[in-house]
Swiss-Prot record:
GO biological process: regulation of transcription by RNA polymerase II
Cross-referenced Pfam families: KRAB, SCAN, zf-C2H2
GO cellular component: nucleus
PANTHER family, per the entry: FINGER PUTATIVE TRANSCRIPTION FACTOR FAMILY-RELATED, GENE, 19965-RELATED
Protein's name according to its UniProt entry: Zinc finger protein 215
Source organism of the structure: Homo sapiens
PROSITE patterns: KRAB, SCAN_BOX, ZINC_FINGER_C2H2_1, ZINC_FINGER_C2H2_2
Zinc finger (C2H2-type): 379-401, 407-429, 462-484, 490-512
SCAN box domain ranges (all copies): 48-126
Length: 517
C-alpha cells in the first residue's frame, strides 16, 4: 500500500480501483501533523485555471493529455511543499466557492480568504450585517444571488402567463436602508441590477428578431402602407428556441412588454434605471446610480452630422438598429435640410412608404441619410488598419500593399499603381516630343534611358545647343540665345544704343529722363 505522498511522485500514474482508493484514504487519515493555513499565490491560481480548463484537443493523444494534466495538477497542489491536509484544504476551498451563488462568490473572491474557515466567516459577516437593526431585506446579497434561480424555477413550469418586466427581477431599498449597506454590497447591488436589466434588454431584441410577421404596418402622418412580403422565419439571429433555453446569465423569458423595454443604448447610462423607475412601479435609491447627462426617451435626438431630425415611434426598431438609426422616441430638428422624417417602424420590413413633409422621401432615403454618417470609414484595410468610406478607395489603397502596378505606359513600358501617375508620366512624353524642335535642337530617343524619362526632361525641357543650359520655358531659351548670337533688338530712340533685354532698355531710358530733369 502506497501513501498519498508517494503516489504524487509517480511520473506515470496508473488508475486505482475503488477498493485501492479507499484503502489509501483510510491509511492517510491517521496523520497528526501540524499544518499552516493554505495561501494561494497568483501562480497557484494560474496553475489551477490551466488544470481546470485544459482541453484535450490541444494535445496529440491520450498519453500526452494525461501527462500534461498530471503536471498541471502538481503545479497547482505543490505536494513537495504542501502537506496532505493543505492539499485537501485547497480542494475543499475550490468546491466551496463553486457552490456559492455567483454574486456572493465574486464578493468572497475579492476578499482573498486563506481557507474555508475564513470563507465561512466572511459569509456570516455579510448575513449578520444585513440582519442588523431588523432590516427588511434579510440576506439581501444571497437573495440577489438567488433571483436568477427563482426565475429559472418559474420558467420550468411552462410558458409564463404574464410578460416578465423589470419589476419582476428588481430588489428595492429605501433611502434609509441603502445608507446602512456596506460599500461592497452597494457595488454588488448596482452590478446585479444592471446585469438583469441588460438581460431583459437583449432578450427583448432577440424575441423580436425571431418572431415571424404576417403583416407589418408603416404609418406616417397621413398615409398607411402594409407590408406585402413576410419576413423569413430564419434570420441571422436564429433565436426560435429562446423561450425554452437558458441564457448565459441564467435568465429565461419569452417576451417583455413595450413599457418594460428601453431603447437600444439607454442602459449605457447607469442612472437611466433611477430616472425611469416609475414605468415599472419600483423604488430605487438615488445614491445607487451615478448621475450622468444622457438623453431620455422623451428627449429629442438630432443627427450629430447635419442636425437632421428623426421621429422613431418604435423603441424596438430592429431595422433602425441594423443601419444605425437611434431607436428612441423624439422629434429632433434638421436645420440644414429643413426636412422632417416621421415614421413608425415596428420591425424589419420591406420599404414601401413615402413621407410628405415638404419633400417626398422614401424610407430608404431616411435610412440612407443616417447610414451615410454611421457607416463612414466602414471599409478597413486588414493589413494596416486604415479605414475608407468607399470600397473603391480601399481597393486602390490595397495596391500599395500588394505592389501591383496595373497601369503601363505604351511609350516606354513603365508601370504605375495609379492612373493619375500614368497620365502625368505621359505628359512628359508629349512635352519631350515637342522639345525636338529647332529651338531646342536635341531629340530624345526611346533608347536613351526610356525607363526614367525625367532624367532628360525634368522641369527644364528647352536646352541651348551652344552651352547646354536648359530652361523650362521657350521664351527663356530664346532670350538666352541672344547672348550667343549678339542680337540686340531693343534700341534707344534718344541715343540709338541697343540692348538685348527690354529691362535693360528701360533702365537706360531712365537715365535720359533724369538728365532732362
Amino acid at each position: 500500500m502506497q501513501p498519498l505522498s508517494k503516489l504524487m511522485a509517480i511520473s506515470k500514474p496508473r488508475n486505482l480501483s475503488l477498493r485501492e482508493q479507499r484503502e489509501v484514504l483510510r491509511a492517510d487519515m491517521s496523520w497528526q501533523q501540524e499544518t499552516n493555513p493554505v495561501v494561494e499565490t497568483h501562480d497557484s491560481e494560474a496553475s489551477r485555471q490551466k488544470f481546470r480548463h485544459f482541453q484535450y484537443l490541444k494535445v496529440s493523444g491520450p498519453h500526452e493529455a494525461l501527462s500534461q494534466l498530471w503536471e498541471l495538477c502538481l503545479q497547482w497542489l505543490r505536494p513537495e511543499i504542501h502537506t496532505k491536509k493543505q492539499i485537501i484544504e485547497l480542494l475543499v476551498l475550490e468546491q466551496f466557492l463553486a457552490i456559492l451563488p455567483e454574486e456572493v462568490r465574486t464578493w468572497v473572491n475579492l476578499q482573498h480568504p486563506n481557507n474555508s474557515k475564513d470563507m465561512v466567516t466572511l459569509i456570516e459577516d455579510v448575513i449578520e450585517m444585513l440582519e442588523d437593526e431588523d432590516m427588511p431585506c434579510k440576506d439581501s446579497a444571497l437573495q440577489m444571488g438567488s433571483i436568477k434561480e427563482k426565475m429559472k424555477a418559474g420558467s420550468r413550469t411552462g410558458k409564463p402567463q404574464e410578460p416578465v418586466t423589470f419589476k419582476d427581477v428588481v430588489v428595492e431599498f429605501s433611502k434609509e436602508e441603502w445608507g446602512q449597506l456596506d460599500s461592497a454590497v452597494k457595488n454588488l447591488y448596482r452590478n446585479v441590477m444592471l446585469e438583469n436589466f441588460r438581460n431583459l434588454n437583449s432578450l427583448r431584441k432577440a424575441h423580436l428578431l425571431s418572431k415571424p410577421f404576417e403583416s407589418l404596418k408603416l404609418e406616417s402622418k397621413k398615409k398607411r402602407w402594409i407590408m406585402e412580403k413576410e419576413i423569413p422565419r430564419k434570420t441571422i439571429f436564429d433565436m426560435k428556441s429562446i423561450s425554452g433555453e437558458e441564457s448565459s446569465h441564467g435568465v429565461i423569458m419569452t417576451r417583455l412588454t413595450e413599457s418594460g423595454h428601453p431603447s437600444s443604448d439607454a442602459w449605457k447610462g447607469e442612472n437611466w434605471l433611477y430616472r425611469n423607475q416609475k414605468k415599472w412601479d419600483i423604488n430605487l435609491p438615488q445614491e445607487a446610480f451615478i448621475p450622468e447627462t444622457i438623453y431620455t426617451e422623451e428627449e429629442d435626438f438630432e443627427c450629430s452630422e447635419n442636425k437632421k431630425s428623426f421621429d422613431i415611434n418604435s423603441v424596438s426598431s430592429i431595422c433602425a438598429i441594423q443601419v444605425g438609426i437611434p431607436s428612441r422616441k423624439g422629434s429632433p430638428k434638421c436645420d440644414k435640410f429643413k426636412t422632417y422624417f416621421k415614421f413608425n417602424l415596428d420591425s424589419v420590413g420591406k420599404q414601401h412608404s413615402e413621407y410628405e413633409y415638404g419633400n417626398d422621401l422614401s424610407l430608404s432615403t431616411d435610412i440612407r441619410h443616417q447610414k451615410s454618417h454611421t457607416t463612414m470609414n466602414s471599409y478597413e484595410c486588414y493589413q494596416c488598419g486604415k479605414a475608407f468610406c468607399r470600397s473603391s478607395s480601399l481597393i486602390r489603397h490595397q495596391i500599395i500593399h500588394t505592389g501591383e502596378k496595373p497601369y503601363k505606359c505604351s511609350e516606354c513600358g513603365r508601370f504605375f499603381n495609379r492612373r493619375t501617375n500614368l497620365t502625368k508620366h505621359q505628359k512628359l512624353h508629349a512635352e519631350a516630343k515637342a522639345c525636338t524642335s529647332n529651338k531646342c535642337g536635341k531629340a530624345f530617343s526611346k533608347s536613351e534611358d526610356s525607363n526614367n524619362p525625367t532624367l532628360h526632361f525634368g522641369n527644364n525641357f528647352y536646352q541651348c545647343v551652344n552651352c547646354g543650359k536648359s530652361f523650362n520655358r521657350s521664351s527663356s531659351l530664346i532670350r538666352h540665345q541672344m547672348i550667343h548670337t549678339g542680337e540686340k533688338p531693343f534700341k534707344c530712340k534718344e541715343c540709338s544704343k541697343a540692348f538685348n533685354r527690354s529691362s535693360n532698355l528701360v533702365k537706360h531710358q531712365k537715365l535720359h529722363t533724369r538728365d532732362k530733369s
